[in-house]
Amino acid sequence: MTSLDFSTILPEVVLAGYALAALMAGAYLGKDRLARTLLWVTVAAFLVVAAMVGLGNHVDGAAFHGMFIDDGFSRFAKVVTLVAAAGVLAMSADYMQRRNMLRFEFPIIVALAVLGMMFMVSAGDLLTLYMGLELQSLALYVVAAMRRDSVRSSEAGLKYFVLGSLSSGLLLYGASLVYGFAGTTGFEGIISTIEAGHLSLGVLFGLVFMLVGLSFKVSAVPFHMWTPDVYEGSPTPVTAFFATAPKVAAMALIARLVFDAFGHVIGDWSQIVAALAVMSMFLGSIAGIGQTNIKRLMAYSSIAHMGFALVGLAAGTAIGVQNMLLYMTIYAVMNIGTFAFILSMERDGVPVTDLAALNRFAWTDPVKALAMLVLMFSLAGVPPTLGFFAKFGVLTAAVDAGMGWLAVLGVIASVIGAFYYLRIVYYMYFGGESEGMTSRMGAVQYLALMVPALAMLVGAISMFGVDSAAGRAAETLVGPVAAIEQPAEAAQAEPVQGE
Protein backbone atom coordinates (compact mmCIF):
# COMPACT_ATOMS: atom_id res chain seq x y z
CA MET A 1 0.00 0.00 0.00
CA THR A 2 1.45 3.36 -1.05
CA SER A 3 0.94 6.69 0.70
CA LEU A 4 -1.44 7.67 -2.12
CA ASP A 5 -3.54 4.58 -1.47
CA PHE A 6 -3.65 5.42 2.23
CA SER A 7 -4.72 9.02 1.67
CA THR A 8 -7.45 7.86 -0.72
CA ILE A 9 -9.03 5.55 1.87
CA LEU A 10 -8.29 7.78 4.89
CA PRO A 11 -11.99 8.42 5.75
CA GLU A 12 -12.64 4.67 5.78
CA VAL A 13 -9.54 4.09 7.90
CA VAL A 14 -10.70 6.71 10.40
CA LEU A 15 -14.17 5.17 10.71
CA ALA A 16 -12.81 1.63 10.96
CA GLY A 17 -10.30 2.72 13.61
CA TYR A 18 -13.05 4.42 15.59
CA ALA A 19 -15.32 1.35 15.43
CA LEU A 20 -12.56 -0.95 16.69
CA ALA A 21 -11.52 1.48 19.44
CA ALA A 22 -15.15 1.90 20.55
CA LEU A 23 -15.62 -1.87 20.64
CA MET A 24 -12.58 -2.27 22.87
CA ALA A 25 -13.67 0.60 25.11
CA GLY A 26 -17.16 -0.81 25.53
CA ALA A 27 -15.85 -4.28 26.31
CA TYR A 28 -13.32 -3.14 28.92
CA LEU A 29 -14.93 -0.08 30.51
CA GLY A 30 -18.38 -1.22 31.50
CA LYS A 31 -20.45 -2.13 28.47
CA ASP A 32 -23.90 -0.52 28.58
CA ARG A 33 -22.79 2.18 30.99
CA LEU A 34 -21.05 3.76 28.00
CA ALA A 35 -23.87 3.09 25.54
CA ARG A 36 -25.35 6.60 25.38
CA THR A 37 -21.91 8.22 25.26
CA LEU A 38 -20.80 5.88 22.49
CA LEU A 39 -23.94 6.64 20.51
CA TRP A 40 -23.28 10.37 20.55
CA VAL A 41 -19.58 9.90 19.85
CA THR A 42 -20.56 7.75 16.87
CA VAL A 43 -22.85 10.52 15.62
CA ALA A 44 -19.93 12.94 15.92
CA ALA A 45 -17.63 10.46 14.14
CA PHE A 46 -20.07 10.19 11.22
CA LEU A 47 -20.26 13.96 10.89
CA VAL A 48 -16.47 14.35 11.10
CA VAL A 49 -15.93 11.71 8.41
CA ALA A 50 -18.66 13.33 6.28
CA ALA A 51 -16.81 16.65 6.59
CA MET A 52 -13.54 14.93 5.61
CA VAL A 53 -15.20 13.46 2.53
CA GLY A 54 -17.30 16.43 1.48
CA LEU A 55 -15.13 19.40 2.38
CA GLY A 56 -11.64 18.05 1.78
CA ASN A 57 -9.53 19.12 -1.18
CA HIS A 58 -9.88 15.84 -3.06
CA VAL A 59 -8.51 14.83 -6.42
CA ASP A 60 -10.31 12.03 -8.23
CA GLY A 61 -8.26 8.87 -8.16
CA ALA A 62 -8.10 5.18 -7.41
CA ALA A 63 -6.31 3.01 -4.87
CA PHE A 64 -5.13 -0.59 -4.84
CA HIS A 65 -4.85 -0.85 -8.63
CA GLY A 66 -8.33 0.47 -9.26
CA MET A 67 -10.15 -1.65 -6.68
CA PHE A 68 -11.18 1.45 -4.71
CA ILE A 69 -12.39 4.59 -6.49
CA ASP A 70 -12.51 8.06 -4.98
CA ASP A 71 -14.45 10.45 -7.21
CA GLY A 72 -17.22 13.00 -7.00
CA PHE A 73 -19.93 10.36 -7.29
CA SER A 74 -18.65 8.27 -4.40
CA ARG A 75 -18.07 11.34 -2.23
CA PHE A 76 -21.63 12.59 -2.75
CA ALA A 77 -23.12 9.19 -1.90
CA LYS A 78 -20.87 8.85 1.16
CA VAL A 79 -21.85 12.24 2.57
CA VAL A 80 -25.57 11.48 2.19
CA THR A 81 -25.10 8.03 3.76
CA LEU A 82 -23.07 9.34 6.70
CA VAL A 83 -25.40 12.25 7.45
CA ALA A 84 -28.47 10.00 7.21
CA ALA A 85 -26.92 7.46 9.59
CA ALA A 86 -25.98 10.25 12.02
CA GLY A 87 -29.52 11.62 11.91
CA VAL A 88 -31.10 8.23 12.63
CA LEU A 89 -28.76 7.53 15.55
CA ALA A 90 -29.29 10.97 17.06
CA MET A 91 -33.08 10.85 16.95
CA SER A 92 -33.13 7.29 18.34
CA ALA A 93 -31.11 7.95 21.50
CA ASP A 94 -33.96 8.96 23.84
CA TYR A 95 -36.33 6.33 22.48
CA MET A 96 -33.86 3.48 22.96
CA GLN A 97 -32.94 4.59 26.45
CA ARG A 98 -36.60 4.84 27.51
CA ARG A 99 -37.30 1.36 26.17
CA ASN A 100 -34.15 -0.10 27.76
CA MET A 101 -32.92 -1.08 24.30
CA LEU A 102 -29.70 0.89 24.16
CA ARG A 103 -26.66 -1.38 24.15
CA PHE A 104 -23.12 -0.26 23.51
CA GLU A 105 -22.85 -2.61 20.52
CA PHE A 106 -25.64 -0.86 18.60
CA PRO A 107 -23.82 2.31 17.46
CA ILE A 108 -20.67 0.28 16.78
CA ILE A 109 -22.50 -2.19 14.54
CA VAL A 110 -24.15 0.73 12.74
CA ALA A 111 -20.68 2.25 12.23
CA LEU A 112 -19.43 -1.01 10.72
CA ALA A 113 -22.49 -1.14 8.44
CA VAL A 114 -21.79 2.42 7.27
CA LEU A 115 -18.14 1.48 6.69
CA GLY A 116 -19.35 -1.28 4.38
CA MET A 117 -21.56 1.22 2.56
CA MET A 118 -18.59 3.51 2.01
CA PHE A 119 -16.66 0.68 0.39
CA MET A 120 -19.71 -0.23 -1.71
CA VAL A 121 -20.05 3.17 -3.37
CA SER A 122 -16.28 3.33 -4.03
CA ALA A 123 -16.05 -0.17 -5.49
CA GLY A 124 -13.97 -0.45 -8.64
CA ASP A 125 -13.78 -4.22 -8.59
CA LEU A 126 -16.21 -7.08 -8.05
CA LEU A 127 -14.21 -8.15 -4.99
CA THR A 128 -14.46 -4.72 -3.36
CA LEU A 129 -18.15 -4.64 -4.21
CA TYR A 130 -18.76 -7.95 -2.46
CA MET A 131 -16.59 -7.13 0.54
CA GLY A 132 -18.42 -3.85 1.20
CA LEU A 133 -21.83 -5.39 0.61
CA GLU A 134 -21.21 -8.26 3.03
CA LEU A 135 -19.77 -6.00 5.73
CA GLN A 136 -22.96 -3.95 5.54
CA SER A 137 -25.24 -6.99 5.38
CA LEU A 138 -23.70 -8.88 8.29
CA ALA A 139 -24.05 -5.81 10.50
CA LEU A 140 -27.68 -5.30 9.44
CA TYR A 141 -28.57 -8.93 10.18
CA VAL A 142 -27.44 -8.38 13.75
CA VAL A 143 -29.28 -5.11 14.39
CA ALA A 144 -32.50 -6.50 12.89
CA ALA A 145 -32.52 -9.17 15.63
CA MET A 146 -31.23 -6.82 18.33
CA ARG A 147 -34.25 -7.39 20.59
CA ARG A 148 -33.41 -10.93 21.64
CA ASP A 149 -36.41 -10.99 23.99
CA SER A 150 -38.78 -10.24 21.09
CA VAL A 151 -40.01 -13.08 18.87
CA ARG A 152 -40.86 -10.64 16.07
CA SER A 153 -37.40 -9.08 16.14
CA SER A 154 -35.72 -12.50 16.04
CA GLU A 155 -38.03 -13.52 13.21
CA ALA A 156 -37.16 -10.35 11.29
CA GLY A 157 -33.44 -10.98 11.70
CA LEU A 158 -33.77 -14.61 10.57
CA LYS A 159 -35.85 -13.73 7.50
CA TYR A 160 -33.43 -11.00 6.54
CA PHE A 161 -30.46 -13.34 6.99
CA VAL A 162 -31.93 -16.20 4.94
CA LEU A 163 -33.08 -14.04 2.04
CA GLY A 164 -29.93 -11.91 2.25
CA SER A 165 -27.79 -15.04 1.96
CA LEU A 166 -29.77 -16.06 -1.12
CA SER A 167 -29.22 -12.67 -2.74
CA SER A 168 -25.50 -12.80 -1.94
CA GLY A 169 -25.31 -16.22 -3.59
CA LEU A 170 -26.98 -14.90 -6.74
CA LEU A 171 -24.64 -11.91 -6.77
CA LEU A 172 -21.59 -14.16 -6.41
CA TYR A 173 -22.82 -16.45 -9.17
CA GLY A 174 -23.24 -13.47 -11.48
CA ALA A 175 -19.81 -12.13 -10.56
CA SER A 176 -18.23 -15.53 -11.28
CA LEU A 177 -19.88 -15.61 -14.72
CA VAL A 178 -18.59 -12.13 -15.52
CA TYR A 179 -15.10 -13.06 -14.33
CA GLY A 180 -15.13 -16.31 -16.28
CA PHE A 181 -16.13 -14.70 -19.57
CA ALA A 182 -14.37 -11.33 -19.20
CA GLY A 183 -11.22 -12.64 -17.54
CA THR A 184 -11.09 -9.89 -14.92
CA THR A 185 -12.92 -8.65 -11.84
CA GLY A 186 -11.99 -4.99 -12.30
CA PHE A 187 -14.67 -2.67 -13.66
CA GLU A 188 -12.12 -1.06 -16.00
CA GLY A 189 -11.13 -4.44 -17.39
CA ILE A 190 -14.75 -5.52 -17.84
CA ILE A 191 -15.74 -2.41 -19.78
CA SER A 192 -12.55 -2.64 -21.88
CA THR A 193 -13.43 -6.23 -22.78
CA ILE A 194 -16.93 -5.16 -23.81
CA GLU A 195 -15.54 -2.19 -25.76
CA ALA A 196 -13.25 -4.52 -27.69
CA GLY A 197 -16.32 -6.35 -28.95
CA HIS A 198 -16.13 -9.37 -26.64
CA LEU A 199 -19.60 -9.08 -25.13
CA SER A 200 -20.59 -12.69 -24.65
CA LEU A 201 -23.91 -14.09 -23.51
CA GLY A 202 -22.18 -15.23 -20.32
CA VAL A 203 -21.30 -11.66 -19.37
CA LEU A 204 -24.90 -10.55 -19.90
CA PHE A 205 -26.19 -13.43 -17.80
CA GLY A 206 -23.69 -12.47 -15.11
CA LEU A 207 -24.95 -8.89 -15.18
CA VAL A 208 -28.55 -10.10 -14.80
CA PHE A 209 -27.67 -12.24 -11.77
CA MET A 210 -25.78 -9.37 -10.16
CA LEU A 211 -28.70 -7.00 -10.72
CA VAL A 212 -30.99 -9.58 -9.11
CA GLY A 213 -28.71 -9.78 -6.06
CA LEU A 214 -28.49 -6.01 -5.74
CA SER A 215 -32.23 -5.56 -6.28
CA PHE A 216 -32.74 -7.38 -2.99
CA LYS A 217 -30.75 -4.68 -1.21
CA VAL A 218 -32.98 -1.89 -2.52
CA SER A 219 -36.21 -3.89 -2.05
CA ALA A 220 -37.02 -3.84 -5.75
CA VAL A 221 -39.90 -6.09 -6.84
CA PRO A 222 -39.89 -9.11 -7.13
CA PHE A 223 -37.06 -9.26 -4.59
CA HIS A 224 -38.88 -7.27 -1.93
CA MET A 225 -40.38 -10.14 0.09
CA TRP A 226 -38.32 -9.49 3.20
CA THR A 227 -39.08 -5.79 3.50
CA PRO A 228 -42.57 -5.60 5.11
CA ASP A 229 -41.87 -8.29 7.72
CA VAL A 230 -38.41 -6.96 8.60
CA TYR A 231 -39.60 -3.34 8.82
CA GLU A 232 -42.50 -4.35 11.07
CA GLY A 233 -40.59 -6.79 13.28
CA SER A 234 -37.36 -4.84 13.80
CA PRO A 235 -37.08 -2.22 16.55
CA THR A 236 -38.30 1.11 15.16
CA PRO A 237 -34.84 2.80 15.26
CA VAL A 238 -33.47 -0.11 13.23
CA THR A 239 -36.34 0.20 10.75
CA ALA A 240 -35.54 3.91 10.41
CA PHE A 241 -31.93 3.02 9.63
CA PHE A 242 -32.95 0.37 7.08
CA ALA A 243 -35.14 2.93 5.31
CA THR A 244 -32.40 5.52 4.84
CA ALA A 245 -28.63 4.99 4.62
CA PRO A 246 -28.51 1.41 3.22
CA LYS A 247 -30.95 2.33 0.46
CA VAL A 248 -28.81 5.30 -0.63
CA ALA A 249 -25.63 3.19 -0.67
CA ALA A 250 -27.21 0.26 -2.51
CA MET A 251 -28.71 2.49 -5.21
CA ALA A 252 -25.34 4.22 -5.66
CA LEU A 253 -23.66 0.81 -5.94
CA ILE A 254 -26.04 -0.28 -8.71
CA ALA A 255 -25.27 2.95 -10.58
CA ARG A 256 -21.53 2.41 -10.11
CA LEU A 257 -21.73 -1.16 -11.43
CA VAL A 258 -23.87 -0.52 -14.51
CA PHE A 259 -21.96 2.56 -15.66
CA ASP A 260 -18.36 1.74 -14.70
CA ALA A 261 -18.45 -1.92 -15.76
CA PHE A 262 -21.28 -2.03 -18.30
CA GLY A 263 -21.47 1.55 -19.55
CA HIS A 264 -21.12 0.46 -23.18
CA VAL A 265 -24.24 -1.71 -23.11
CA ILE A 266 -26.74 0.75 -21.65
CA GLY A 267 -29.39 -0.47 -24.06
CA ASP A 268 -29.12 -3.98 -22.58
CA TRP A 269 -29.44 -3.21 -18.88
CA SER A 270 -31.70 -0.14 -18.99
CA GLN A 271 -34.69 -2.28 -19.99
CA ILE A 272 -34.08 -4.62 -17.04
CA VAL A 273 -33.85 -1.67 -14.65
CA ALA A 274 -36.99 -0.13 -16.18
CA ALA A 275 -38.91 -3.38 -15.63
CA LEU A 276 -37.79 -3.49 -11.99
CA ALA A 277 -38.86 0.15 -11.63
CA VAL A 278 -42.36 -0.44 -13.00
CA MET A 279 -43.00 -3.50 -10.83
CA SER A 280 -41.68 -1.74 -7.73
CA MET A 281 -43.69 1.44 -8.28
CA PHE A 282 -46.96 -0.40 -8.78
CA LEU A 283 -46.64 -3.09 -6.14
CA GLY A 284 -45.44 -0.60 -3.52
CA SER A 285 -48.28 1.78 -4.37
CA ILE A 286 -51.05 -0.82 -4.49
CA ALA A 287 -50.00 -3.15 -1.66
CA GLY A 288 -49.62 -0.26 0.77
CA ILE A 289 -53.30 0.69 0.48
CA GLY A 290 -54.57 -2.07 2.75
CA GLN A 291 -51.97 -1.68 5.51
CA THR A 292 -53.00 -0.71 9.04
CA ASN A 293 -49.54 -0.75 10.63
CA ILE A 294 -47.55 2.40 9.87
CA LYS A 295 -44.17 0.59 9.85
CA ARG A 296 -45.46 -1.97 7.37
CA LEU A 297 -46.95 0.85 5.31
CA MET A 298 -43.55 2.56 5.23
CA ALA A 299 -42.05 -0.68 3.94
CA TYR A 300 -44.31 -0.59 0.89
CA SER A 301 -43.62 3.12 0.60
CA SER A 302 -39.91 2.29 0.45
CA ILE A 303 -40.50 -0.27 -2.31
CA ALA A 304 -42.42 2.27 -4.38
CA HIS A 305 -39.82 5.00 -3.89
CA MET A 306 -37.00 2.68 -4.94
CA GLY A 307 -38.97 2.14 -8.14
CA PHE A 308 -39.00 5.87 -8.82
CA ALA A 309 -35.27 6.12 -8.16
CA LEU A 310 -34.69 3.25 -10.60
CA VAL A 311 -36.56 5.27 -13.25
CA GLY A 312 -33.78 7.86 -13.16
CA LEU A 313 -31.17 5.13 -13.40
CA ALA A 314 -32.97 3.42 -16.29
CA ALA A 315 -32.66 6.62 -18.32
CA GLY A 316 -28.96 5.85 -18.66
CA THR A 317 -27.93 9.51 -18.83
CA ALA A 318 -26.04 11.92 -16.60
CA ILE A 319 -29.22 13.90 -15.95
CA GLY A 320 -30.94 10.66 -14.98
CA VAL A 321 -28.21 9.81 -12.48
CA GLN A 322 -28.27 13.37 -11.12
CA ASN A 323 -32.01 13.15 -10.50
CA MET A 324 -31.63 9.68 -9.00
CA LEU A 325 -29.07 11.04 -6.52
CA LEU A 326 -31.33 13.97 -5.68
CA TYR A 327 -34.27 11.61 -5.28
CA MET A 328 -32.37 9.39 -2.86
CA THR A 329 -31.18 12.41 -0.87
CA ILE A 330 -34.70 13.82 -0.55
CA TYR A 331 -36.07 10.35 0.20
CA ALA A 332 -33.61 9.92 3.08
CA VAL A 333 -34.54 13.31 4.55
CA MET A 334 -38.27 12.58 4.29
CA ASN A 335 -37.85 9.23 6.01
CA ILE A 336 -35.80 10.67 8.86
CA GLY A 337 -38.60 13.13 9.59
CA THR A 338 -41.33 10.50 9.25
CA PHE A 339 -39.61 7.99 11.51
CA ALA A 340 -38.89 10.70 14.08
CA PHE A 341 -42.66 11.00 14.36
CA ILE A 342 -43.23 7.22 14.39
CA LEU A 343 -40.69 6.88 17.22
CA SER A 344 -42.75 9.32 19.29
CA MET A 345 -46.06 7.45 18.94
CA GLU A 346 -47.15 5.90 22.24
CA ARG A 347 -50.22 5.22 24.35
CA ASP A 348 -49.91 4.96 28.13
CA GLY A 349 -46.15 4.78 27.74
CA VAL A 350 -46.30 1.87 25.28
CA PRO A 351 -45.23 2.32 21.62
CA VAL A 352 -48.04 2.08 19.08
CA THR A 353 -47.82 1.71 15.31
CA ASP A 354 -51.50 1.28 14.43
CA LEU A 355 -52.80 3.90 12.00
CA ALA A 356 -56.03 4.22 13.99
CA ALA A 357 -54.00 5.66 16.87
CA LEU A 358 -53.54 8.80 14.77
CA ASN A 359 -57.25 9.65 14.96
CA ARG A 360 -57.66 13.41 15.56
CA PHE A 361 -54.02 13.78 16.57
CA ALA A 362 -54.04 17.26 15.01
CA TRP A 363 -56.51 18.36 17.68
CA THR A 364 -54.07 17.60 20.49
CA ASP A 365 -50.74 18.53 18.83
CA PRO A 366 -51.32 20.70 15.74
CA VAL A 367 -47.65 21.63 15.18
CA LYS A 368 -46.40 18.05 14.93
CA ALA A 369 -49.43 17.09 12.88
CA LEU A 370 -48.67 19.91 10.44
CA ALA A 371 -45.06 18.75 10.10
CA MET A 372 -46.27 15.20 9.45
CA LEU A 373 -48.76 16.52 6.88
CA VAL A 374 -45.95 18.24 4.97
CA LEU A 375 -43.86 15.04 5.03
CA MET A 376 -46.79 12.92 3.83
CA PHE A 377 -47.52 15.38 1.02
CA SER A 378 -43.86 15.25 0.03
CA LEU A 379 -43.77 11.44 0.07
CA ALA A 380 -46.91 11.44 -2.08
CA GLY A 381 -45.35 13.92 -4.52
CA VAL A 382 -47.85 16.72 -3.96
CA PRO A 383 -46.66 20.14 -5.21
CA PRO A 384 -45.09 22.40 -4.12
CA THR A 385 -43.17 20.09 -1.78
CA LEU A 386 -39.68 18.87 -2.59
CA GLY A 387 -40.96 15.33 -3.07
CA PHE A 388 -42.93 16.51 -6.11
CA PHE A 389 -39.81 17.96 -7.75
CA ALA A 390 -37.87 14.78 -6.96
CA LYS A 391 -40.43 12.65 -8.82
CA PHE A 392 -40.72 15.21 -11.60
CA GLY A 393 -36.94 15.07 -12.08
CA VAL A 394 -36.65 11.31 -12.55
CA LEU A 395 -39.74 11.16 -14.77
CA THR A 396 -38.43 14.02 -16.93
CA ALA A 397 -35.11 12.18 -17.29
CA ALA A 398 -37.01 9.14 -18.56
CA VAL A 399 -38.87 11.26 -21.14
CA ASP A 400 -35.62 12.87 -22.30
CA ALA A 401 -34.12 9.39 -22.74
CA GLY A 402 -36.95 8.32 -25.04
CA MET A 403 -38.77 6.32 -22.36
CA GLY A 404 -41.98 8.29 -22.18
CA TRP A 405 -43.97 5.13 -21.48
CA LEU A 406 -42.01 4.70 -18.24
CA ALA A 407 -42.80 8.26 -17.17
CA VAL A 408 -46.52 7.75 -17.85
CA LEU A 409 -46.55 4.59 -15.73
CA GLY A 410 -44.68 6.49 -13.02
CA VAL A 411 -47.36 9.18 -12.92
CA ILE A 412 -50.11 6.55 -12.63
CA ALA A 413 -48.28 4.73 -9.82
CA SER A 414 -47.70 8.03 -8.00
CA VAL A 415 -51.42 8.85 -8.10
CA ILE A 416 -52.29 5.40 -6.72
CA GLY A 417 -49.66 5.60 -3.98
CA ALA A 418 -50.83 9.02 -2.84
CA PHE A 419 -53.89 7.34 -1.31
CA TYR A 420 -52.19 5.85 1.72
CA TYR A 421 -50.15 8.97 2.49
CA LEU A 422 -53.27 11.10 2.36
CA ARG A 423 -55.08 8.53 4.49
CA ILE A 424 -52.60 9.25 7.31
CA VAL A 425 -53.43 12.95 6.98
CA TYR A 426 -57.14 12.10 7.05
CA TYR A 427 -56.73 10.13 10.27
CA MET A 428 -54.85 12.99 11.94
CA TYR A 429 -57.35 15.69 11.00
CA PHE A 430 -60.69 13.98 10.40
CA GLY A 431 -60.45 10.57 12.08
CA GLY A 432 -63.24 9.18 14.19
CA GLU A 433 -63.52 9.19 17.95
CA SER A 434 -61.24 6.54 19.42
CA GLU A 435 -58.52 6.06 21.97
CA GLY A 436 -55.78 8.28 20.63
CA MET A 437 -52.08 8.56 21.30
CA THR A 438 -49.51 10.94 22.65
CA SER A 439 -46.33 12.08 20.95
CA ARG A 440 -43.33 12.06 23.25
CA MET A 441 -40.20 13.68 21.85
CA GLY A 442 -36.89 14.91 23.11
CA ALA A 443 -35.31 18.04 21.67
CA VAL A 444 -33.20 16.19 19.09
CA GLN A 445 -36.13 14.07 17.95
CA TYR A 446 -38.29 17.18 17.65
CA LEU A 447 -35.65 18.78 15.42
CA ALA A 448 -35.46 15.56 13.38
CA LEU A 449 -39.17 16.00 12.63
CA MET A 450 -39.29 19.74 12.08
CA VAL A 451 -36.12 20.27 10.03
CA PRO A 452 -37.03 17.74 7.29
CA ALA A 453 -40.59 19.11 7.16
CA LEU A 454 -39.25 22.63 6.72
CA ALA A 455 -36.73 21.39 4.15
CA MET A 456 -39.55 19.94 2.05
CA LEU A 457 -40.96 23.46 1.68
CA VAL A 458 -37.82 25.60 1.57
CA GLY A 459 -36.06 23.13 -0.73
CA ALA A 460 -38.67 23.77 -3.40
CA ILE A 461 -37.27 27.31 -3.59
CA SER A 462 -33.57 26.55 -3.16
CA MET A 463 -31.64 23.35 -2.49
CA PHE A 464 -28.56 25.33 -1.40
CA GLY A 465 -26.21 23.70 -3.89
CA VAL A 466 -27.21 20.08 -3.32
CA ASP A 467 -28.63 19.84 -6.85
CA SER A 468 -25.46 21.18 -8.45
CA ALA A 469 -23.34 18.84 -6.30
CA ALA A 470 -25.47 15.92 -7.52
CA GLY A 471 -24.95 17.11 -11.09
CA ARG A 472 -21.18 17.16 -10.68
CA ALA A 473 -21.30 13.72 -9.07
CA ALA A 474 -23.33 12.34 -11.98
CA GLU A 475 -20.96 13.78 -14.56
CA THR A 476 -18.06 12.17 -12.72
CA LEU A 477 -19.70 8.77 -13.12
CA VAL A 478 -21.33 9.09 -16.54
CA GLY A 479 -19.70 12.05 -18.26
CA PRO A 480 -21.18 15.36 -19.46
CA VAL A 481 -24.83 15.25 -20.43
CA ALA A 482 -24.17 16.01 -24.09
CA ALA A 483 -21.74 13.10 -24.40
CA ILE A 484 -24.24 10.47 -23.32
CA GLU A 485 -26.10 8.48 -25.94
CA GLN A 486 -29.71 7.83 -25.05
CA PRO A 487 -30.48 4.16 -24.42
CA ALA A 488 -33.43 4.10 -26.81
CA GLU A 489 -31.29 5.57 -29.60
CA ALA A 490 -28.46 3.17 -28.82
CA ALA A 491 -30.78 0.18 -28.96
CA GLN A 492 -32.08 1.29 -32.37
CA ALA A 493 -28.60 1.98 -33.71
CA GLU A 494 -27.09 -1.41 -32.86
CA PRO A 495 -28.95 -3.49 -35.52
CA VAL A 496 -28.11 -0.90 -38.20
CA GLN A 497 -24.41 -1.17 -37.41
CA GLY A 498 -24.56 -4.93 -37.75
CA GLU A 499 -26.15 -4.88 -41.21
From Swiss-Prot:
Statement: the UniProt record of this protein carries the keyword Amino-acid biosynthesis: no
GO cellular component, one term: plasma membrane
Entry keywords, A to Z: Cell inner membrane, Cell membrane, Membrane, NAD, Quinone, Translocase, Transmembrane, Transmembrane helix, Ubiquinone
Enzyme Commission (EC) number: 7.1.1.-
Topology within the bilayer: Multi-pass membrane protein
GO MF, one example: quinone binding
Family annotation (Pfam families): Proton_antipo_M
First-listed, main subcellular location of the protein, grouped into a coarse class: membrane
Subcellular location: Cell inner membrane
InterPro entries in UniProt: NADH-Q_OxRdtase_suN/2 (IPR010096), ND/Mrp_TM (IPR001750)
Recorded superkingdom: Bacteria
Known role: NDH-1 shuttles electrons from NADH, via FMN and iron-sulfur (Fe-S) centers, to quinones in the respiratory chain. The immediate electron acceptor for the enzyme in this species is believed to be ubiquinone. Couples the redox reaction to proton translocation (for every two electrons transferred, four hydrogen ions are translocated across the cytoplasmic membrane), and thus conserves the redox energy in a proton gradient.
Family: Belongs to the complex I subunit 2 family.
Subunit structure: NDH-1 is composed of at least 14 different subunits, Nqo1 to Nqo14. The complex has a L-shaped structure, with the hydrophobic arm (subunits Nqo7, Nqo8, Nqo10 to Nqo14) embedded in the inner membrane and the hydrophilic peripheral arm (subunits Nqo1 to Nqo6, Nqo9) protruding into the bacterial cytoplasm. The hydrophilic domain contains all the redox centers. NADH-quinone oxidoreductase forms a supercomplex with ubiquinol-cytochrome c reductase complex (complex III or cytochrome b-c1 complex) and cytochrome c oxidase (complex IV), which stabilizes the NADH-quinone oxidoreductase complex.
Protein name, UniProt field: NADH-quinone oxidoreductase subunit N
Organism: Paracoccus denitrificans (strain Pd 1222)
Taxon lineage: Bacteria, Pseudomonadati, Pseudomonadota, Alphaproteobacteria, Rhodobacterales
